[in-house]
């Protein structure tokens, strides 16, 4: 792999701070609790602070060596609680990386390159429970909860100038559609939401590098990006670079969906270098361990895989425990059958053995593993619809009902839980999904893949799905799983990753504005004001993608002088509506001034006497 050279070149661009941006930190109540924000310096002297997911990669003051991983954020907090213990951990096997021989040259090379990324695993002490939900139910406000509160609030002082018009704010007030969003997020509010199961803070005790974040209906809508190799393409260094690229553009969480070789080592590199929570679908690696033959899967192999990944620091597992034997026949009349990889694997296993899935029958055993490491459940929708004509059918909602039952079992163990959702759903059927999920799953956070609203957009599915994502985000979904232009077509590269993330940042932000999340619209107002003032650089820099905005502008007006011009190439200097509006305002102001002078000349009386000739 020659990791040092390849990573150095791949990460060079990704470490560049955004234009006119600097990293700053909000201080918490205890030493070491520092929450990052990105400050955008405007040409008029204003500073706009925005939520930041890029971790230390965009902080020039931080030295990063990806061969060793990121510095710990939470290590001292975890140790201070006194309820964990270090231990030797399971023995790493060649099969973990898809290798058959323990003494192979390739395996030795992989392990040597990842040697500095190894950590002694932690687990809960005997009889202890180390989940954020457990602490929350006991009334404990953890540093992670305070971190989340500071992060959700951000630095709000700059917003006030855009929120002073009371009439405007009332006119534009959002509709939360049943959500309960306070004006200020307090640590106690975070604790209460986690205790109720309405929010999760995915943060494995073996992932101390993670910057805590919350997924819940009453917080900002989050987005997830998927990366991972396949049996056909990609490499470890490419996947790590995709991770850093994804969080640069705004991915709140990242899932490693690797299905090819070197799965274990790829995950070492990803987790140790990730400041955001990492999720996986453990059944993928378990399937690799049995040569891709679903029928050969066993509970013992799956259990070993869960512990393996929990020790590495994975923050949440997608587990398709809701795929029950009786539900499989409900998919027979579908146009596209079972489209979830995990769902199809478990369906095949159930049919081959003609009994319930071991994920379902051993669910409480899985809970015991989850709570020992604080791994969150992402209960998978293995029977989600794969096309619009299969949406909201009996199979989909039967599984959802089971996921609601499993959620209550997980909560009995104080295991944090979110619910995965579709998929492909026409616009007029989206609300029914949200309503059913809130009722059936007891307000556990909903995490949806889109949904795609139409099926005729190959190459543009990121747009077709962002429409549904914006809608369901407004209705109450807590996290949106991005879709890239390559959906249904192939493994996304870094450009596809960026396009998918930007589409979903748009959807999530639109949902926050519609819900009336405090201050959500202020950045829009700042950009609108920059646009009206013809502050082109500020327009670029306030956008979600400054690079593309500047590139499009400069295709026709590349000179520096165009950055202060009061027009663009769309309308030119004579037909710019904003320039004309400014001129109209100037004329109106001049007219008012003229009338004021006339008023003063006539004596300053409101009513001027009329002198009539006798």
Curated annotation (Swiss-Prot):
Gene Ontology cellular component annotations, sorted alphabetically: cytosol
What Pfam families does the entry give? ThiC-associated, ThiC_Rad_SAM
Q: Could you say which residues bind [4Fe-4S] cluster here? A: 568, 571, 576
Q: Which GO terms describe its molecular function?
A: 4 iron, 4 sulfur cluster binding; carbon-carbon lyase activity; zinc ion binding
Q: What is its EC number?
A: 4.1.99.17
Cofactor dependence is on: [4Fe-4S] cluster
Task: Tell me one GO biological process term.
Answer: thiamine biosynthetic process
Q: Which reaction does it catalyse?
A: 5-amino-1-(5-phospho-beta-D-ribosyl)imidazole + S-adenosyl-L-methionine = 4-amino-2-methyl-5-(phosphooxymethyl)pyrimidine + CO + 5'-deoxyadenosine + formate + L-methionine + 3 H(+)
Signal sequence segment:
none
Under the heading InterPro entries, the entry gives:
ThiC (IPR037509), ThiC-associated_dom (IPR025747), ThiC/Bza_core_dom (IPR038521), ThiC/BzaA/B (IPR002817)
Pathway(s) the chain acts in: Cofactor biosynthesis; thiamine diphosphate biosynthesis
How does the cofactor bind to this protein, according to its record? Binds 1 [4Fe-4S] cluster per subunit. The cluster is coordinated with 3 cysteines and an exchangeable S-adenosyl-L-methionine.
Identify the residues that bind Zn(2+). Answer: 424, 488
Which top-level enzyme class is recorded in the Swiss-Prot or TrEMBL entry? lyase
Positions contributing to substrate binding = 226, 255, 284, 320, 340-342, 381-384, 420, 447
- List the keywords (alphabetical): 4Fe-4S, Iron, Iron-sulfur, Lyase, Metal-binding, S-adenosyl-L-methionine, Thiamine biosynthesis, Zinc
PANTHER family from the xrefs?
Answer: PHOSPHOMETHYLPYRIMIDINE SYNTHASE, CHLOROPLASTIC, THIAMINE BIOSYNTHESIS PROTEIN THIC
Assembly, per entry = Homodimer.
Q: Which family does it belong to?
A: Belongs to the ThiC family.
Q: What is the stated purpose of this protein?
A: Catalyzes the synthesis of the hydroxymethylpyrimidine phosphate (HMP-P) moiety of thiamine from aminoimidazole ribotide (AIR) in a radical S-adenosyl-L-methionine (SAM)-dependent reaction.
Know the name of this protein? Answer: Phosphomethylpyrimidine synthase
Top-level taxonomy? Bacteria, Pseudomonadati, Pseudomonadota, Betaproteobacteria, Burkholderiales
Q: Which gene encodes it?
A: thiC
């Amino acid at each position: 792999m020659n990791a040092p050279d390849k990573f150095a070149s791949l990460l060079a661009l990704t470490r560049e701070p955004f234009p006119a941006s600097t990293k700053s930190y909000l201080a918490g109540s205890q030493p070491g609790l520092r929450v990052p924000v990105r400050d955008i310096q405007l040409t008029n002297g204003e500073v706009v602070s925005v939520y930041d997911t890029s971790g230390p990669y965009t902080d020039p003051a931080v030295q990063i060596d990806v061969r060793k991983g990121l510095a710990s954020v939470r290590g001292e907090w975890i140790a201070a609680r006194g309820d964990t213990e270090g231990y030797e951990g399971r023995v790493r096997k060649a099969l973990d990386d898809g290798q058959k021989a323990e003494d192979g040259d390739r395996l030795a090379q992989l392990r040597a390159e990842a040697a500095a990324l190894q950590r002694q695993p932690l687990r809960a002490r005997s009889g202890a429970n180390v989940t954020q939900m457990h602490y929350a139910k006991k009334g404990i406000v953890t540093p992670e909860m305070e971190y989340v509160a500071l992060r959700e609030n951000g630095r709000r002082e700059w917003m006030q100038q855009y929120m002073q018009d009371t009439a405007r704010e009332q006119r534009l007030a959002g509709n939360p559609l049943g959500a309960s969003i306070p004006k200020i997020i307090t640590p106690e509010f975070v604790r209460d939401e986690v205790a109720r199961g309405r929010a999760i803070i995915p943060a494995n005790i073996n992932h101390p590098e993670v910057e805590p974040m919350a997924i819940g209906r009453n917080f900002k809508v989050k987005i997830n990006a998927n990366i991972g190799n396949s049996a056909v393409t990609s490499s470890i260094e490419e996947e790590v670079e995709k991770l850093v690229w994804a969080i640069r553009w705004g991915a709140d969480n990242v899932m490693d969906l690797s299905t090819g070789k070197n799965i274990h080592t790829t995950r070492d590199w990803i987790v140790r270098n990730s400041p955001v929570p990492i999720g996986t679908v453990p059944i993928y690696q378990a399937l690799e361990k049995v040569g891709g033959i679903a029928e050969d899967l066993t509970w013992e192999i799956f259990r070993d895989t869960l512990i393996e990944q929990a020790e590495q620091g994975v923050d949440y597992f997608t587990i398709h425990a809701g795929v029950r034997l009786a539900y499989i026949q409900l998919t027979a009349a579908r146009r596209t059958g079972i489209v979830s990889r995990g769902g199809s694997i478990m369906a095949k296993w159930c049919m081959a053995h003609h009994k319930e899935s071991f994920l379902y029958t051993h669910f409480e055993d899985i809970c015991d593993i989850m709570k020992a490491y604080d791994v969150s459940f992402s209960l998978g929708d293995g029977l989600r619809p794969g096309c619009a004509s299969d949406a909201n059918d009996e199979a989909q909602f039967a599984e959802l009902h089971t996921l609601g039952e499993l959620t209550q079992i997980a909560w009995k163990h104080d295991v944090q839980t979110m619910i995965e959702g579709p998929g492909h759903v026409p616009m007029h059927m989206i609300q029914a999904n949200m309503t059913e999920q809130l009722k059936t799953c007891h307000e556990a956070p909903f995490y949806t893949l889109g949904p795609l609203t139409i099926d005729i957009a190959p190459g543009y599915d990121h747009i077709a799905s962002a429409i549904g994502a914006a809608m369901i985000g407004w209705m109450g979904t807590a996290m949106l799983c991005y879709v890239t232009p390559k959906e249904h077509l192939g493994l996304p590269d870094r450009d596809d990753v960026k396009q998918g993330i930007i589409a979903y940042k748009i959807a999530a932000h639109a949902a926050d504005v519609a819900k009336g999340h405090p201050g959500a619209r202020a950045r829009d107002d700042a950009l609108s004001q920059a646009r009206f003032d013809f502050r082109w650089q500020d327009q670029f820099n306030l956008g979600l993608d400054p690079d593309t905005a500047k590139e499009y502008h400069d295709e026709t007006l590349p000179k520096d002088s165009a950055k202060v011009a009061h027009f663009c190439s769309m309308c030119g200097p004579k037909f710019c509506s904003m320039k004309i509006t400014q001129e109209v305002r100037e004329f109106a102001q001049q007219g008012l001034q003229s009338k004021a002078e006339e008023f003063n000349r006539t004596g300053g009386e409101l009513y001027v006497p009329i002198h009539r000739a006798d």
